[in-house]
């Protein structure tokens, strides 16, 4: 893809950068761990809603901005590079990339009319409920079931590690509706948080992305009308794949932005820190570390934006998405470890910028699909494409 940006895109990036610096960063300090309806989290969310950052990929007719995936990524990368909290941005991204886009692209006319404007305006927060105690990377081994009756679908099961669960108003829940193997026996449902039989539990504290609330959901014959079936019976796999394409590109732009900020911090440090009578950067080992950090950042960025461009062009390459996602996660963690070493003893302090950056990047190796699983999927897809 071309790295050149149009005047409109430059303005979009500048606006996002200013919003992060002037609005989000001053509010971050008051958001507590887990962000369970804390004043800081809600203040950041409401500010994003007022500035129309809660419906970036949704159509203007639905109250959104109508941005492409690539332009959404530019917004999130710019905010993270400016210093906005990656955890909060992750929460904001899940709402849009994992949920709102699926409702917009796969939902029925009635579903879109009911939910999209609320989601674009930020008054309805979305969450995607997929993982289970015995079904993590083995997604389609899920045991949650939806039983059809004249009244609708009664859903029973447990979902865990759900980003946005404590603050969500609407869940997209994947559940088994048949005995067909793999994805073909899975359907997806729109389940409001107020549904009888649905219980939300706050998740345990995380080392990183602390301002991204997460938790679990228990469903005890939670009844939803048949009109809440998203994507048709047996269509849950397609909904999940669509969500993952957007999520793995959109959310990982946050990691790119955080890598950019960390790289800038490291560059300034090695330029001004003096040891043995000369700046750190004059040491060959330090210079090599800085060069490798920049190489990882730029290579990761190219992979991720190329994968997104293919999605925007209507020709998604799932292998490219998996490879990009995996490489961004690995590169972010590698840069985090390098940053700690460059800052020395100060770099391992709990509240040092290097430690916070590394802790925020570690989840990107696991969330939205573990790194090694992504490589396995990508290889399988490439073998299938080149028999």
Protein language model annotation of sequence segments:
Residues 1-92, 114, 118, 334, ...:
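Amphipathic, small/basic residue-rich leader segments at the start of a protein or domain
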Residues 2-5, 74, 242, 343-387:
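Glycine-rich phosphate/cofactor-binding loops in nucleotide/flavin-utilizing enzymes
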Residues 3-7, 12, 199-298, 364, ...:
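Glycine-rich beta->alpha junctions and the first turn(s) of the following alpha-helix
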Residues 24, 87-110, 136:
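N-terminal glycine-rich flavin-associated loop
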Residues 25-36, 267, 271-279, 294-327, ...:
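C-terminal helix-coil-helix/basic helical segment that borders enzyme active sites and/or dimer interfaces
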Residues 122-130:
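A short, Trp-centered hydrophobic/proline-enriched beta-strand micro-motif
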Residues 144-147:
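A structural signal for short hydrophobic beta-strand segments in well-ordered beta-sheet cores
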Residues 154-200:
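A short core secondary-structure module
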């Amino acid at each position: 893809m071309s790295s050149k940006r149009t005047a409109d895109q430059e303005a979009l990036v500048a606006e996002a950068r200013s919003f992060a610096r002037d609005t989000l960063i001053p509010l971050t300090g008051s958001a507590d761990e887990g962000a369970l309806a804390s004043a800081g989290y809600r203040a950041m969310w409401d500010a994003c809603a007022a500035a129309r950052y809660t419906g970036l990929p949704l159509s203007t007719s639905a109250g959104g901005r109508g941005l492409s995936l690539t332009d959404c990524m530019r917004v999130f990368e710019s905010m993270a590079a400016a210093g906005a909290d990656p955890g909060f941005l992750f929460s904001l991204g899940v709402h849009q990339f994992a949920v709102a886009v699926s409702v917009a692209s796969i939902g029925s006319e009635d579903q879109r009319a009911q939910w999209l404007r609320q989601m674009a305006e930020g008054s309805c927060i979305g969450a995607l409920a997929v993982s289970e105690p015995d079904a993590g990377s083995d997604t389609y081994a899920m045991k949650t079931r939806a039983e059809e009756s004249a009244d609708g679908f009664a859903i029973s099961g447990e979902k865990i590690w759900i980003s946005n669960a404590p603050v969500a108003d609407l869940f997209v829940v994947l559940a088994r509706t048949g005995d067909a193997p793999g994805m073909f026996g899975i359907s997806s449902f729109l389940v409001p948080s107020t549904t009888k039989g649905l219980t939300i539990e706050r998740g345990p504290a995380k080392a990183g992305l602390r301002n991204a609330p997460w938790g679990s959901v228990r469903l005890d014959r939670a009844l939803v009308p048949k009109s809440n079936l998203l994507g048709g019976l047996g269509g849950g796999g397609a909904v999940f794949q669509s969500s993952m394409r957007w999520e793995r590109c959109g959310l990982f732009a946050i990691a790119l932005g955080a890598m950019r900020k960390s790289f800038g911090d490291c560059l300034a440090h090695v330029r001004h820190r003096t040891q043995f009578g000369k700046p750190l950067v004059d040491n060959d080992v330090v210079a090599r570390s800085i060069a490798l950090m920049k190489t990882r950042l730029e290579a990761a960025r190219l992979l991720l934006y190329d994968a997104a461009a293919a999605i925007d062009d209507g020709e998604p390459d799932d292998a490219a998405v998996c490879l990009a996602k995996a490489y961004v996660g690995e590169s972010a963690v590698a840069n985090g470890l390098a940053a700690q070493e460059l800052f020395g003893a100060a770099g391992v302090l709990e509240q040092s910028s290097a430690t916070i950056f590394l802790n925020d990047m570690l989840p990107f190796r696991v969330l939205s699909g573990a790194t090694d699983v992504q490589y396995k999927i990508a290889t399988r897809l490439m073998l299938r494409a080149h028999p």
